[in-house]
Curated annotation (Swiss-Prot):
InterPro entries: BEN_domain (IPR018379), BEND6-like (IPR037496). Residues 155-242 are annotated as: Disordered. Transmembrane segments: none annotated. This is Early boundary activity protein 1. GO terms for biological process: embryonic development via the syncytial blastoderm; heterochromatin boundary formation; negative regulation of Notch signaling pathway; positive regulation of neuron differentiation. GO terms for cellular component: chromatin silencing complex; nucleus. Keywords: DNA-binding, Nucleus, Repressor, Transcription, Transcription regulation. PANTHER family: BEN DOMAIN-CONTAINING PROTEIN 6. The BEN domain mediates DNA-binding. The heterotrimeric Elba complex is required for chromatin domain boundary function during early embryogenesis. It binds to a 8-bp sequence 5'-CCAATAAG-3' in the Fab-7 insulator or boundary element in the bithorax complex and contributes to its insulator or boundary activity. Elba1 may act as a transcriptional repressor and binds the palindromic sequence 5'-CCAATTGG-3' to mediate transcriptional repression. It comes from the Eukaryota. GO terms for molecular function: chromatin insulator sequence binding; sequence-specific DNA binding; transcription corepressor activity.
């Protein structure tokens, strides 16, 4: 094994340069100074044999062949740096290593390659987990987005339903002044008096009320009751009630909300009358006349009197109204709209008669 002095001296002898034409770098100058100092060292006094000399020359030739492939000339004519020479010397030393060292290096390389494979596999598994987690997050975000879109669609549909419902209510309320005007015109029309209580839209409660002083006014028409024939129509019996569990109770539950009506009053109603007339009868049994005069079906002011200074009315109990609608739609061939129209008309009539009574009292 050659020492540092021999390696540097041998590398310097192989340099293909002319000291007069080639300018050395600072690093190369330091190399020459080191070699000159080593040449003055007397520690290397061993004499070589002929065989050793031939072997050294042969090794030198092999080293020269390999070193020449690593020595490069720069554009300015300078030689390679000290690192190139050192690399060539290390390659020469590496060729002189023992088989045990080569085996250790091979084992190290195998272990290093195995470590790299394990590292790459671990990194790939971590990336796969991240991709799966990202996929789950993306699906969750898509589900949440779908839910939000459905909520927005429902919110967009709600104003349409609400608008249609308000239009229906406004239409019902707009019919109130017309019905009041129609009823008022019928009441004050004396040219063609009507003799049918059903055509007048009056019930027994309306007929029972006679304002004070009306008997003395001969110019007012009188209501003529229907003539009783010798063969009157058979009175239809009171229908059965779904929620009437106790037949001996004086009150009958007519709907799922627990609204009760007197059993005697239900038996006294002529169920052969039209649906609106029966609705008005039952409405007077559920609410008193003062309540009907000061309440409406929706509780909203009529659009016909929006700019007028009219007192606002309250809403009828929606549970009782729902029970009445339930009874009439299940017992008779009526639609919920027909029942609500009859309720609206009855409230308008009671309010009109209340105002008439108040005007007569003020006079």
């Amino acid at each position: 094994m050659i020492n540092r002095r021999q390696r540097l001296e041998f590398a310097l002898t192989l340099l293909p340069y002319d000291p007069e034409t080639v300018q050395l770098s600072e690093t190369q100058k330091k190399v020459e100074a080191i070699i000159a100092r080593l040449r003055t060292d007397d520690s290397f006094t061993e004499e070589e044999s002929d065989d050793c000399k031939v072997r050294r020359i042969q090794d030198a030739n092999e080293f020269a062949d390999s070193a020449m492939r690593h020595i490069e000339m720069s554009d300015s004519g300078k030689l390679s740096t000290l690192e190139t020479l050192t690399l060539a010397a290390e390659k020469l030393l590496r060729t002189q290593r023992s088989p045990d060292q080569d085996f250790d290096d091979m084992v190290q390389d195998v272990e290093y390659s195995q470590l790299m494979r394990n590292t790459i596999q671990a990194v790939n598994e971590a990336r796969l987990k991240l991709l799966q987690q990202w996929e789950r997050s993306k699906r969750k975000a898509l589900d949440l987005l779908t839910i939000e879109i459905e909520k927005v669609q429902e919110m967009d549909q709600e104003p349409e339903h609400k608008q249609s419902h308000e239009q229906d209510q406004d239409q019902e309320q707009s019919s109130e002044p017309f019905n009041a005007f129609r009823d008022g015109a019928d009441e004050h029309n004396t040219s063609t008096p009507k003799t049918n209580d059903e055509d007048l839209g009056l019930d027994d409660d309306d007929e029972d009320y006679v304002p004070g002083g009306e008997e003395t006014m001969g110019n007012k028409r009188k209501r003529i009751k229907k003539p009783v024939t010798s063969t009157p129509n058979a009175k239809r019996r009171c229908p059965g009630f779904e929620f009437d569990l106790d037949g001996e109770s004086p009150m009958v539950t007519i709907g799922p909300n627990g609204t009760e009506v007197s059993r005697i009053s239900l038996s006294a109603i002529n169920w052969d009358m039209t649906g609106p007339s029966i609705t008005r009868k039952l409405l007077c049994e559920i609410f008193d006349r003062d309540t009907l005069a000061h309440h409406t079906l929706s509780g909203k002011p009529s659009p016909a009197f929006r700019d007028c200074a009219r007192p606002s009315k309250q809403q009828l109990d929606p549970l009782k109204v729902a029970d009445l609608v339930y009874l009439m739609t299940n017992s008779l061939d009526m639609t919920p709209r027909e029942v609500r129209t009859a309720i609206t008309t009855k409230c308008a009539d009671e309010n009109k008669m209340l105002r008439s009574r108040m005007q007569r009292k003020s006079k």
